[in-house]
Protein backbone atom coordinates (compact mmCIF):
# COMPACT_ATOMS: atom_id res chain seq x y z
CA UNK A 1 0.00 0.00 0.00
CA UNK A 2 2.84 2.35 0.79
CA UNK A 3 4.42 1.67 -2.58
CA UNK A 4 1.15 2.37 -4.37
CA UNK A 5 0.77 5.65 -2.48
CA UNK A 6 4.36 6.73 -3.21
CA UNK A 7 4.30 6.31 -7.00
CA UNK A 8 1.47 8.84 -7.66
CA UNK A 9 3.15 11.32 -5.38
CA UNK A 10 6.44 10.96 -7.24
CA UNK A 11 4.68 11.34 -10.59
CA UNK A 12 2.99 14.55 -9.45
CA UNK A 13 6.32 15.85 -8.14
CA UNK A 14 7.91 15.01 -11.48
CA UNK A 15 5.18 16.87 -13.35
CA UNK A 16 5.53 19.84 -11.02
CA UNK A 17 9.28 20.01 -11.60
CA UNK A 18 8.78 19.81 -15.35
CA UNK A 19 6.17 22.56 -15.29
CA UNK A 20 8.34 24.72 -13.07
CA UNK A 21 11.29 24.22 -15.41
CA UNK A 22 9.28 25.16 -18.50
CA UNK A 23 7.80 28.21 -16.76
CA UNK A 24 11.27 29.44 -15.80
CA UNK A 25 12.54 28.86 -19.32
CA UNK A 26 9.53 30.69 -20.79
CA UNK A 27 10.04 33.62 -18.45
CA UNK A 28 13.68 33.88 -19.46
CA UNK A 29 12.74 33.47 -23.12
CA UNK A 30 10.41 36.50 -22.87
CA UNK A 31 13.21 38.63 -21.47
CA UNK A 32 15.61 37.55 -24.23
CA UNK A 33 13.31 38.07 -27.24
CA UNK A 34 14.76 41.48 -28.06
CA UNK A 35 18.33 40.18 -27.80
CA UNK A 36 17.51 37.17 -30.00
CA UNK A 37 15.86 39.37 -32.65
CA UNK A 38 18.90 41.63 -32.61
CA UNK A 39 21.29 38.67 -32.97
CA UNK A 40 19.47 37.24 -36.01
CA UNK A 41 20.47 39.55 -38.84
CA UNK A 42 18.81 37.74 -41.78
CA UNK A 43 15.62 35.78 -42.30
CA UNK A 44 17.32 32.79 -43.95
CA UNK A 45 17.63 30.08 -42.62
CA UNK A 46 15.74 30.96 -39.42
CA UNK A 47 12.24 31.44 -40.88
CA UNK A 48 12.63 28.56 -43.34
CA UNK A 49 13.62 26.20 -40.52
CA UNK A 50 10.60 27.23 -38.44
CA UNK A 51 8.32 26.63 -41.41
CA UNK A 52 9.86 23.23 -42.23
CA UNK A 53 9.44 22.04 -38.63
CA UNK A 54 5.86 23.41 -38.55
CA UNK A 55 6.47 25.94 -35.80
CA UNK A 56 4.88 28.58 -38.04
CA UNK A 57 2.37 28.14 -40.85
CA UNK A 58 3.07 28.76 -44.50
CA UNK A 59 0.76 31.77 -44.52
CA UNK A 60 2.61 33.40 -41.65
CA UNK A 61 5.92 32.66 -43.39
CA UNK A 62 4.71 34.51 -46.49
CA UNK A 63 3.43 37.40 -44.36
CA UNK A 64 6.83 37.76 -42.69
CA UNK A 65 8.61 37.78 -46.05
CA UNK A 66 6.15 40.35 -47.42
CA UNK A 67 6.86 42.62 -44.48
CA UNK A 68 10.59 42.29 -45.22
CA UNK A 69 9.96 43.25 -48.84
CA UNK A 70 8.03 46.29 -47.57
CA UNK A 71 11.27 47.55 -45.96
CA UNK A 72 10.27 46.54 -42.44
CA UNK A 73 13.40 46.03 -40.28
CA UNK A 74 14.55 42.43 -39.99
CA UNK A 75 14.71 42.51 -36.20
CA UNK A 76 11.03 43.48 -35.99
CA UNK A 77 10.11 40.61 -38.32
CA UNK A 78 12.12 38.15 -36.21
CA UNK A 79 10.49 39.51 -33.04
CA UNK A 80 7.08 38.81 -34.55
CA UNK A 81 8.15 35.21 -35.25
CA UNK A 82 9.42 34.87 -31.66
CA UNK A 83 6.01 35.99 -30.37
CA UNK A 84 4.50 33.10 -32.32
CA UNK A 85 7.04 30.70 -30.77
CA UNK A 86 6.13 32.02 -27.31
CA UNK A 87 2.59 30.71 -27.77
CA UNK A 88 3.89 27.17 -28.48
CA UNK A 89 6.84 27.27 -26.11
CA UNK A 90 8.44 24.04 -24.92
CA UNK A 91 11.91 22.48 -24.93
CA UNK A 92 11.64 21.67 -28.65
CA UNK A 93 11.38 25.41 -29.39
CA UNK A 94 14.73 26.02 -27.70
CA UNK A 95 16.27 23.04 -29.50
CA UNK A 96 15.12 24.46 -32.82
CA UNK A 97 16.24 27.99 -31.94
CA UNK A 98 19.76 26.96 -30.94
CA UNK A 99 20.42 24.25 -33.51
CA UNK A 100 23.74 23.86 -35.29
CA UNK A 101 22.69 25.71 -38.45
CA UNK A 102 21.47 28.78 -36.55
CA UNK A 103 24.55 28.84 -34.31
CA UNK A 104 26.84 28.83 -37.35
CA UNK A 105 24.78 31.44 -39.21
CA UNK A 106 24.23 33.75 -36.21
CA UNK A 107 27.30 33.69 -33.90
CA UNK A 108 25.73 36.21 -31.52
CA UNK A 109 23.32 33.51 -30.32
CA UNK A 110 26.14 31.83 -28.37
CA UNK A 111 25.95 34.36 -25.53
CA UNK A 112 22.16 34.07 -25.39
CA UNK A 113 22.36 30.27 -25.31
CA UNK A 114 24.77 30.47 -22.37
CA UNK A 115 22.40 32.79 -20.54
CA UNK A 116 19.74 30.04 -20.67
CA UNK A 117 22.20 27.76 -18.88
CA UNK A 118 22.30 30.18 -15.96
CA UNK A 119 18.57 29.97 -15.24
CA UNK A 120 19.38 27.13 -12.79
CA UNK A 121 22.73 27.01 -10.98
CA UNK A 122 23.46 23.38 -11.84
CA UNK A 123 22.87 24.04 -15.60
CA UNK A 124 21.47 20.51 -16.05
CA UNK A 125 18.25 21.69 -17.61
CA UNK A 126 19.99 23.34 -20.54
CA UNK A 127 22.06 20.38 -21.67
CA UNK A 128 19.14 19.07 -23.73
CA UNK A 129 19.55 22.03 -26.07
CA UNK A 130 23.05 20.92 -27.00
CA UNK A 131 21.72 17.80 -28.67
CA UNK A 132 20.57 15.57 -25.83
CA UNK A 133 17.09 14.41 -24.96
CA UNK A 134 15.18 16.97 -22.90
CA UNK A 135 13.26 14.26 -21.09
CA UNK A 136 16.46 12.58 -19.93
CA UNK A 137 17.75 15.90 -18.65
CA UNK A 138 14.53 16.54 -16.79
CA UNK A 139 15.03 13.27 -14.94
CA UNK A 140 18.16 14.73 -13.37
CA UNK A 141 16.07 17.45 -11.73
CA UNK A 142 13.97 14.85 -9.93
CA UNK A 143 16.82 13.86 -7.62
CA UNK A 144 18.22 10.44 -6.85
CA UNK A 145 14.89 9.25 -5.41
CA UNK A 146 13.46 8.75 -8.90
CA UNK A 147 16.38 6.57 -9.96
CA UNK A 148 15.93 4.40 -6.89
CA UNK A 149 12.23 4.03 -7.52
CA UNK A 150 12.84 2.94 -11.11
CA UNK A 151 15.65 0.57 -10.21
CA UNK A 152 13.93 -1.25 -7.30
CA UNK A 153 10.45 -2.70 -7.86
CA UNK A 154 9.46 -2.74 -4.20
CA UNK A 155 11.47 0.05 -2.69
CA UNK A 156 8.80 2.42 -1.45
CA UNK A 157 10.61 3.03 1.83
CA UNK A 158 13.79 3.82 -0.09
CA UNK A 159 11.85 6.28 -2.24
CA UNK A 160 10.55 8.17 0.78
CA UNK A 161 13.93 8.30 2.49
CA UNK A 162 15.64 9.35 -0.70
CA UNK A 163 13.14 12.14 -1.35
CA UNK A 164 13.51 13.39 2.22
CA UNK A 165 17.29 13.30 1.89
CA UNK A 166 17.05 15.21 -1.39
CA UNK A 167 14.98 17.97 0.29
CA UNK A 168 17.49 18.23 3.14
CA UNK A 169 20.31 18.49 0.63
CA UNK A 170 18.47 21.31 -1.14
CA UNK A 171 18.25 23.20 2.14
CA UNK A 172 21.97 22.72 2.75
CA UNK A 173 22.80 23.85 -0.76
CA UNK A 174 20.67 26.99 -0.41
CA UNK A 175 22.49 27.87 2.82
CA UNK A 176 25.83 27.26 1.13
CA UNK A 177 24.83 29.44 -1.81
CA UNK A 178 23.94 32.34 0.51
CA UNK A 179 27.30 32.00 2.24
CA UNK A 180 29.08 31.92 -1.11
CA UNK A 181 27.28 35.08 -2.22
CA UNK A 182 28.45 37.00 0.84
CA UNK A 183 32.01 35.71 0.38
CA UNK A 184 32.00 36.66 -3.29
CA UNK A 185 30.70 40.13 -2.43
CA UNK A 186 33.53 40.60 0.10
CA UNK A 187 36.13 39.26 -2.31
CA UNK A 188 34.93 41.61 -5.05
CA UNK A 189 35.77 44.59 -2.80
CA UNK A 190 39.12 43.14 -1.63
CA UNK A 191 42.42 43.67 -3.57
CA UNK A 192 42.73 39.92 -4.26
CA UNK A 193 39.56 39.85 -6.33
CA UNK A 194 41.33 38.82 -9.53
CA UNK A 195 43.03 35.84 -7.89
CA UNK A 196 39.74 34.58 -6.45
CA UNK A 197 38.02 34.86 -9.83
CA UNK A 198 40.81 32.94 -11.51
CA UNK A 199 40.42 30.21 -8.90
CA UNK A 200 36.66 30.10 -9.49
CA UNK A 201 37.17 29.83 -13.24
CA UNK A 202 39.56 26.91 -12.79
CA UNK A 203 37.12 25.13 -10.47
CA UNK A 204 34.25 25.75 -12.86
CA UNK A 205 36.22 24.41 -15.82
CA UNK A 206 37.08 21.32 -13.78
CA UNK A 207 33.45 20.76 -12.72
CA UNK A 208 31.91 21.53 -16.15
CA UNK A 209 33.33 18.41 -17.80
CA UNK A 210 30.82 16.17 -19.61
CA UNK A 211 31.59 13.29 -17.24
CA UNK A 212 30.50 15.16 -14.13
CA UNK A 213 27.31 16.35 -15.81
CA UNK A 214 26.31 13.08 -17.44
CA UNK A 215 26.90 10.62 -14.57
CA UNK A 216 24.00 10.03 -12.21
CA UNK A 217 24.68 9.83 -8.44
CA UNK A 218 24.56 6.28 -7.05
CA UNK A 219 23.88 7.19 -3.43
CA UNK A 220 22.77 10.13 -1.36
CA UNK A 221 26.27 11.32 -0.39
CA UNK A 222 27.39 11.30 -4.04
CA UNK A 223 24.33 13.41 -5.00
CA UNK A 224 25.07 15.95 -2.27
CA UNK A 225 28.71 16.18 -3.37
CA UNK A 226 27.84 16.59 -7.05
CA UNK A 227 25.18 19.19 -6.33
CA UNK A 228 27.55 21.06 -4.02
CA UNK A 229 30.31 21.10 -6.64
CA UNK A 230 27.96 22.43 -9.29
CA UNK A 231 26.47 25.14 -7.07
CA UNK A 232 29.58 26.36 -5.30
CA UNK A 233 31.11 27.84 -8.45
CA UNK A 234 28.38 28.66 -10.97
CA UNK A 235 30.53 31.34 -12.63
CA UNK A 236 31.43 30.63 -16.24
CA UNK A 237 33.86 32.16 -18.70
CA UNK A 238 32.18 34.47 -21.16
CA UNK A 239 34.15 36.22 -23.88
CA UNK A 240 32.24 39.50 -24.11
CA UNK A 241 34.42 41.54 -26.42
CA UNK A 242 37.97 41.88 -27.64
CA UNK A 243 38.88 45.47 -28.38
CA UNK A 244 42.08 46.67 -29.94
CA UNK A 245 42.74 50.34 -29.33
CA UNK A 246 45.13 51.67 -31.91
CA UNK A 247 46.96 54.95 -31.49
CA UNK A 248 47.72 56.20 -34.98
CA UNK A 249 47.73 59.92 -34.37
CA UNK A 250 50.86 61.78 -35.44
CA UNK A 251 51.48 65.03 -33.48
CA UNK A 252 54.00 67.75 -34.23
CA UNK A 253 57.20 67.12 -32.34
CA UNK A 254 58.91 63.98 -31.11
CA UNK A 255 57.99 64.58 -27.46
CA UNK A 256 54.26 64.72 -28.16
CA UNK A 257 54.36 61.55 -30.24
CA UNK A 258 56.26 59.68 -27.52
CA UNK A 259 53.82 60.82 -24.83
CA UNK A 260 50.88 59.86 -27.00
CA UNK A 261 52.19 56.36 -27.73
CA UNK A 262 53.02 55.74 -24.07
CA UNK A 263 49.51 56.65 -22.96
CA UNK A 264 47.59 54.84 -25.73
CA UNK A 265 49.25 51.43 -25.83
CA UNK A 266 47.49 48.57 -27.56
CA UNK A 267 45.59 46.39 -25.15
CA UNK A 268 43.36 43.36 -25.36
CA UNK A 269 40.51 43.21 -22.85
CA UNK A 270 38.88 39.93 -21.88
CA UNK A 271 35.91 40.15 -19.56
CA UNK A 272 34.98 37.26 -17.28
CA UNK A 273 31.38 37.65 -16.25
CA UNK A 274 28.58 35.48 -14.99
CA UNK A 275 25.10 35.39 -16.48
CA UNK A 276 22.22 36.79 -14.48
CA UNK A 277 19.86 34.07 -13.21
CA UNK A 278 16.18 34.37 -12.39
CA UNK A 279 16.88 33.46 -8.73
CA UNK A 280 18.52 36.87 -8.21
CA UNK A 281 22.09 35.55 -7.86
CA UNK A 282 24.70 38.15 -8.82
CA UNK A 283 28.19 36.81 -9.22
CA UNK A 284 31.46 38.70 -9.33
CA UNK A 285 32.89 40.03 -12.58
CA UNK A 286 36.57 40.44 -13.32
CA UNK A 287 38.54 41.92 -16.18
CA UNK A 288 42.09 40.95 -17.03
CA UNK A 289 44.14 43.15 -19.32
CA UNK A 290 46.96 41.68 -21.39
CA UNK A 291 49.13 44.56 -22.67
CA UNK A 292 50.82 43.98 -25.99
CA UNK A 293 54.06 45.40 -27.31
CA UNK A 294 53.79 49.12 -28.15
CA UNK A 295 54.17 49.91 -31.82
CA UNK A 296 56.73 52.52 -32.95
CA UNK A 297 55.48 56.02 -33.63
CA UNK A 298 56.50 55.98 -37.29
CA UNK A 299 54.67 52.74 -38.12
CA UNK A 300 51.33 52.93 -39.88
CA UNK A 301 48.34 51.12 -38.42
CA UNK A 302 46.21 48.95 -40.69
CA UNK A 303 42.66 50.20 -41.15
CA UNK A 304 40.28 48.67 -38.63
CA UNK A 305 37.12 47.08 -39.94
CA UNK A 306 34.00 48.15 -38.09
CA UNK A 307 30.72 46.31 -38.27
CA UNK A 308 27.49 48.14 -37.72
CA UNK A 309 25.73 46.45 -34.79
CA UNK A 310 22.72 48.75 -34.76
CA UNK A 311 19.38 47.13 -34.12
CA UNK A 312 17.49 49.08 -36.75
CA UNK A 313 18.18 47.86 -40.28
CA UNK A 314 15.33 49.70 -41.97
CA UNK A 315 17.89 51.84 -43.72
CA UNK A 316 19.49 48.89 -45.48
CA UNK A 317 17.53 49.16 -48.69
CA UNK A 318 16.19 52.71 -48.49
CA UNK A 319 19.60 54.17 -47.54
CA UNK A 320 21.28 52.27 -50.40
CA UNK A 321 18.79 53.79 -52.88
CA UNK A 322 19.42 57.30 -51.50
CA UNK A 323 23.20 56.81 -51.73
CA UNK A 324 22.91 55.62 -55.32
CA UNK A 325 20.88 58.70 -56.22
CA UNK A 326 23.47 60.96 -54.63
CA UNK A 327 26.27 59.21 -56.51
CA UNK A 328 24.48 59.50 -59.84
CA UNK A 329 23.82 63.19 -59.22
CA UNK A 330 27.47 63.78 -58.34
CA UNK A 331 28.66 61.88 -61.42
CA UNK A 332 26.27 63.86 -63.61
CA UNK A 333 27.57 67.14 -62.24
CA UNK A 334 31.15 66.02 -62.81
CA UNK A 335 30.31 65.00 -66.37
CA UNK A 336 28.55 68.25 -67.24
CA UNK A 337 31.10 70.43 -65.49
CA UNK A 338 30.43 73.93 -64.20
CA UNK A 339 27.86 76.10 -65.89
CA UNK A 340 26.16 79.49 -65.63
CA UNK A 341 22.70 79.86 -64.10
CA UNK A 342 20.93 83.24 -64.30
CA UNK A 343 24.19 85.15 -64.77
CA UNK A 344 25.55 83.70 -61.49
CA UNK A 345 29.13 82.70 -62.13
CA UNK A 346 30.18 79.29 -60.82
CA UNK A 347 33.88 78.38 -60.52
CA UNK A 348 34.95 76.41 -63.55
CA UNK A 349 37.57 73.70 -63.80
CA UNK A 350 40.90 74.67 -65.39
CA UNK A 351 40.29 72.50 -68.46
CA UNK A 352 36.85 74.03 -69.05
CA UNK A 353 38.15 77.54 -68.34
CA UNK A 354 40.97 77.35 -70.88
CA UNK A 355 38.66 75.96 -73.56
CA UNK A 356 36.05 78.65 -72.92
CA UNK A 357 38.57 81.51 -72.93
CA UNK A 358 40.28 80.23 -76.07
CA UNK A 359 36.98 80.04 -77.92
CA UNK A 360 35.94 83.53 -76.82
CA UNK A 361 39.33 84.99 -77.78
CA UNK A 362 39.03 83.73 -81.37
CA UNK A 363 35.98 85.40 -83.01
CA UNK A 364 36.25 83.27 -86.14
CA UNK A 365 35.57 80.12 -84.11
CA UNK A 366 32.41 81.50 -82.50
CA UNK A 367 29.11 80.26 -83.85
CA UNK A 368 26.75 83.00 -84.96
CA UNK A 369 23.81 83.53 -87.22
CA UNK A 370 24.72 83.81 -90.90
CA UNK A 371 23.23 86.83 -92.68
CA UNK A 372 22.56 87.02 -96.37
CA UNK A 373 24.29 89.44 -98.71
CA UNK A 374 23.13 93.05 -98.44
CA UNK A 375 21.35 94.61 -101.41
CA UNK A 376 23.38 97.56 -102.64
CA UNK A 377 21.71 100.97 -102.73
CA UNK A 378 22.01 103.64 -105.35
CA UNK A 379 23.01 106.78 -103.52
CA UNK A 380 22.21 109.26 -106.30
CA UNK A 381 19.10 107.50 -107.68
CA UNK A 382 16.43 109.49 -109.52
CA UNK A 383 12.84 108.89 -108.30
CA UNK A 384 11.21 111.63 -110.41
CA UNK A 385 9.49 109.43 -113.02
CA UNK A 386 5.81 108.42 -113.02
CA UNK A 387 6.76 104.76 -112.75
CA UNK A 388 9.48 103.31 -110.54
CA UNK A 389 11.20 99.91 -111.07
CA UNK A 390 10.54 97.63 -108.08
CA UNK A 391 11.89 94.20 -107.06
CA UNK A 392 10.63 91.66 -104.48
CA UNK A 393 12.52 88.39 -104.36
CA UNK A 394 12.40 86.90 -107.88
CA UNK A 395 9.57 89.17 -109.07
CA UNK A 396 10.22 92.38 -111.00
CA UNK A 397 7.83 95.13 -112.14
CA UNK A 398 6.98 98.84 -112.24
CA UNK A 399 5.13 100.86 -109.59
CA UNK A 400 2.61 103.50 -110.74
CA UNK A 401 2.73 106.45 -108.32
CA UNK A 402 -0.79 107.72 -109.08
CA UNK A 403 -2.45 104.36 -108.49
CA UNK A 404 -0.27 103.79 -105.39
CA UNK A 405 -1.77 106.93 -103.82
CA UNK A 406 -5.30 105.51 -104.09
CA UNK A 407 -4.73 102.71 -101.56
CA UNK A 408 -3.10 99.42 -100.80
CA UNK A 409 -5.90 97.46 -102.40
CA UNK A 410 -5.41 99.12 -105.80
CA UNK A 411 -3.41 97.21 -108.38
CA UNK A 412 -0.58 99.67 -108.75
CA UNK A 413 2.26 97.33 -109.78
CA UNK A 414 2.63 95.93 -113.32
CA UNK A 415 4.75 92.85 -113.83
CA UNK A 416 6.94 91.92 -116.81
CA UNK A 417 4.14 89.86 -118.29
CA UNK A 418 1.77 92.81 -118.03
CA UNK A 419 -0.19 91.45 -115.10
CA UNK A 420 -1.26 93.93 -112.42
CA UNK A 421 -0.65 93.29 -108.70
CA UNK A 422 -1.44 94.94 -105.44
CA UNK A 423 1.57 95.43 -103.13
CA UNK A 424 0.52 92.38 -101.08
CA UNK A 425 -0.01 90.22 -104.16
CA UNK A 426 3.38 91.28 -105.54
CA UNK A 427 5.00 90.19 -102.27
CA UNK A 428 3.39 86.76 -102.69
CA UNK A 429 4.59 86.62 -106.29
CA UNK A 430 8.18 87.10 -105.10
CA UNK A 431 7.87 84.22 -102.54
CA UNK A 432 8.13 86.60 -99.58
CA UNK A 433 4.65 85.99 -98.21
CA UNK A 434 6.04 84.80 -94.88
CA UNK A 435 7.36 88.26 -94.12
CA UNK A 436 3.87 89.85 -94.35
CA UNK A 437 5.52 93.26 -94.60
CA UNK A 438 5.40 94.46 -98.20
CA UNK A 439 6.79 97.92 -97.27
CA UNK A 440 10.02 96.19 -96.20
CA UNK A 441 10.06 93.43 -98.83
CA UNK A 442 9.52 95.53 -101.99
CA UNK A 443 12.56 97.63 -103.01
CA UNK A 444 13.25 100.28 -105.57
CA UNK A 445 16.92 100.71 -106.57
CA UNK A 446 17.98 99.14 -103.25
CA UNK A 447 15.69 101.34 -101.15
CA UNK A 448 12.62 99.85 -99.43
CA UNK A 449 9.20 101.42 -99.92
CA UNK A 450 9.15 102.32 -96.21
CA UNK A 451 12.29 104.39 -96.61
CA UNK A 452 10.89 106.08 -99.73
CA UNK A 453 7.68 106.92 -97.88
CA UNK A 454 9.69 108.36 -94.97
CA UNK A 455 11.77 110.46 -97.42
CA UNK A 456 8.60 111.77 -99.09
CA UNK A 457 9.26 110.24 -102.48
CA UNK A 458 6.03 108.22 -102.24
CA UNK A 459 2.80 109.04 -100.49
CA UNK A 460 1.62 106.65 -97.79
CA UNK A 461 -1.40 104.83 -99.31
CA UNK A 462 -4.61 104.63 -97.27
CA UNK A 463 -5.59 101.31 -95.73
CA UNK A 464 -9.32 101.51 -96.48
CA UNK A 465 -10.98 100.67 -99.75
CA UNK A 466 -12.49 103.56 -101.72
CA UNK A 467 -16.27 103.33 -101.98
CA UNK A 468 -17.48 103.18 -105.60
CA UNK A 469 -20.48 105.45 -106.46
CA UNK A 470 -23.74 103.74 -107.08
CA UNK A 471 -25.27 103.56 -110.54
CA UNK A 472 -28.05 106.20 -110.73
CA UNK A 473 -30.20 103.99 -112.88
CA UNK A 474 -30.21 101.25 -110.23
CA UNK A 475 -31.18 103.74 -107.54
CA UNK A 476 -34.13 104.96 -109.63
CA UNK A 477 -35.38 101.45 -110.16
CA UNK A 478 -35.21 100.78 -106.43
CA UNK A 479 -37.17 103.94 -105.66
CA UNK A 480 -39.86 103.09 -108.20
CA UNK A 481 -40.19 99.61 -106.81
CA UNK A 482 -40.98 101.06 -103.40
Curated annotation (Swiss-Prot):
Keywords: Cytoplasm, DNA-binding, Isopeptide bond, Nucleus, Phosphoprotein, Transcription, Transcription regulation, Ubl conjugation. The modification Phosphoserine is found at residues 174, 190, 314, 318-319. One of its GO terms (biological process) is negative regulation of endothelial cell migration. Residues 147-160, 250-264, 274-292 have a biased composition (Polar residues). The keyword Phosphoprotein applies. It is found in: Nucleus; Nucleus, PML body; Nucleus, Nuclear body; Cytoplasm. Residues 378-459 form the SAND domain. Its main location: nucleus. InterPro entries: HSR_dom, SAND-like_dom_sf, SAND_dom, Sp110/Sp140/Sp140L-like. A motif (PxVxL motif) lies at residues 230-243. SMART domains: SAND (SM00258). GO terms for cellular component: cytoplasm; nucleus; PML body. Together with PML, this tumor suppressor is a major constituent of the PML bodies, a subnuclear organelle involved in a large number of physiological processes including cell growth, differentiation and apoptosis. Functions as a transcriptional coactivator of ETS1 and ETS2. Under certain conditions, it may also act as a corepressor of ETS1 preventing its binding to DNA. Through the regulation of ETS1 it may play a role in angiogenesis, controlling endothelial cell motility and invasion. Through interaction with the MRN complex it may be involved in the regulation of telomeres lengthening. Homodimer. Interacts with members of the HP1 family of nonhistone chromosomal protein, such as CBX5 and CBX3 via the PxVxL motif. Interacts with ETS1; the interaction is direct and modulates ETS1 transcriptional activity. Interacts with the MRN complex which is composed of two heterodimers RAD50/MRE11 associated with a single NBN; recruits the complex to PML-related bodies. Interacts with HIPK2; positively regulates TP53-dependent transcription. Interacts with CASP8AP2; may negatively regulate CASP8AP2 export from the nucleus to the cytoplasm. The HSR domain is important for the nuclear body targeting as well as for the dimerization. This is Nuclear autoantigen Sp-100. It comes from Mus musculus.
Amino acid sequence: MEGSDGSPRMSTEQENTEMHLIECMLKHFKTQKVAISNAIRSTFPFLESLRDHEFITGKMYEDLLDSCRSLVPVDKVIYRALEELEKKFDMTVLCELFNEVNMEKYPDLNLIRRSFGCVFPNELCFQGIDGGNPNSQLSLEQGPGASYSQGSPNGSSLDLSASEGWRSNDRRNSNLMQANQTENHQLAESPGHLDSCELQVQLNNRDATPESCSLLPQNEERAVQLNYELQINPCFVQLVDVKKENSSFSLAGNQQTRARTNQNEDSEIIELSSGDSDNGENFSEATTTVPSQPAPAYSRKPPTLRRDRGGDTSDTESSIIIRRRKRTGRKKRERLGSYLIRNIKIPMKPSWKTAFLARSANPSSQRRRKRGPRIPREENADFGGAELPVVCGNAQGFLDKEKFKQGIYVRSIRGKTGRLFTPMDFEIEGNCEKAKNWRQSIRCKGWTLRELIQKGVLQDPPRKKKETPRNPRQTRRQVNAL
